[in-house]
């Protein structure tokens, strides 16, 4: 049985968010194919996540023991490390993703939990795990230097040791004349197909 962490980073509501229409379809199909797996949904806008403050540094760099697992910040890092698979649903905002997702990543990027420092340099601790990033974008950004959200996620997840990463991108949603519903449906089809083997 696998533990799946479904990370949602969009201020829009369920029925409004084009990203969530695709990611929720992915999750539903995944459940059908993996009924025994545990799926934990983490809606970042409903969590008590904020930008790190000076007082938080002691918690991040303090001891990593049983007591620290209840720490208001470290609990996210432990939860992230405990998962086997990750579904990250976040739209492109201003060439990246919503700031709350970066704030969350700062919570989970903790030495001794998701990676460690060695004499040879940092080493990821989350090997043999997999992730999918589901993103809706207003324009076409495949292989574009302007696309920094997916590239950053691939880099930071790789830093944690997660190398098996897929992306489902729904592009050109804000281009005049584009059939948005059709684009979203194409994204849902891709999501359903990938969910069957994720």
UniProtKB/Swiss-Prot annotation:
Q: Does the keyword Flavoprotein apply?
A: yes
The record's free-text note on cofactor binding? Binds 1 FMN per subunit.
Identify the enzyme class: oxidoreductase
Any Pfam family from its record, for instance, is Flavodoxin_2
Instruction: Give the catalysed reaction(s), semicolon-separated.
Output: 2 a quinone + NADH + H(+) = 2 a 1,4-benzosemiquinone + NAD(+); N,N-dimethyl-1,4-phenylenediamine + anthranilate + 2 NAD(+) = 2-(4-dimethylaminophenyl)diazenylbenzoate + 2 NADH + 2 H(+)
* Cofactor list: FMN
For whether the record's keyword set contains Flavoprotein, the answer is yes
Q: Which Gene3D superfamilies match?
A: 3.40.50.360
Stated EC number for the protein is: 1.6.5.-, 1.7.1.17
- Please name the InterPro entries in this protein's record: Flavodoxin_fold (IPR003680), Flavoprotein-like_sf (IPR029039), FMN-dep_NADH:Q_OxRdtase_AzoR1 (IPR050104), NADH:quinone_OxRdtase_FMN_depd (IPR023048)
Name the positions where FMN binds. Answer: 92-95, 136-139
Report keywords, A-Z. Answer: Flavoprotein, FMN, NAD, Oxidoreductase
Record's signal peptide: none
- Domain of life according to the entry: Bacteria
Q: Which GO terms describe its molecular function?
A: electron transfer activity; FMN binding; oxidoreductase activity, acting on NAD(P)H as acceptor; oxidoreductase activity, acting on NAD(P)H, quinone or similar compound as acceptor
What is this protein's function per UniProt?
A: Quinone reductase that provides resistance to thiol-specific stress caused by electrophilic quinones. Also exhibits azoreductase activity. Catalyzes the reductive cleavage of the azo bond in aromatic azo compounds to the corresponding amines.
Question: What subunit structure does UniProt give?
Answer: Homodimer.
Family note: Belongs to the azoreductase type 1 family.
| Full protein name | FMN-dependent NADH:quinone oxidoreductase
Task: State the organism of origin.
Answer: Clostridium perfringens (strain ATCC 13124 / DSM 756 / JCM 1290 / NCIMB 6125 / NCTC 8237 / Type A)
């Amino acid at each position: 049985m696998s533990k799946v962490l479904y990370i949602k980073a969009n201020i829009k509501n369920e029925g409004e968010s084009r990203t969530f229409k695709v990611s929720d379809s992915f999750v539903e199909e995944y459940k059908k194919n993996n009924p025994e797996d545990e799926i934990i949904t983490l809606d970042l806008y409903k969590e008590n996540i904020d930008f790190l403050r000076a007082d938080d540094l002691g918690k991040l760099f303090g001891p990593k023991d049983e007591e620290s697992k209840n720490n208001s910040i470290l609990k996210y890092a432990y939860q992230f490390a405990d998962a086997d698979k990750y579904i990250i649903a976040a739209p492109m905002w201003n060439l990246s993703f919503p700031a709350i997702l970066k704030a969350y990543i700062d919570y989970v990027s903790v030495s001794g939990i998701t990676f460690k420092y060695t004499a040879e340099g940092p080493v990821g601790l989350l090997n043999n795990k997999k992730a999918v990033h589901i993103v809706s974008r207003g324009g076409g950004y495949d292989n574009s230097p302007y696309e920094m959200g997916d590239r950053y996620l691939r880099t930071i997840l790789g830093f944690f040791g997660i190398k098996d990463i897929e992306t489902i991108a729904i592009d050109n949603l804000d281009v005049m004349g584009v059939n948005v519903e059709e684009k979203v449906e194409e994204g849902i089809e891709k999501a359903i197909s990938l969910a069957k083997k994720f």
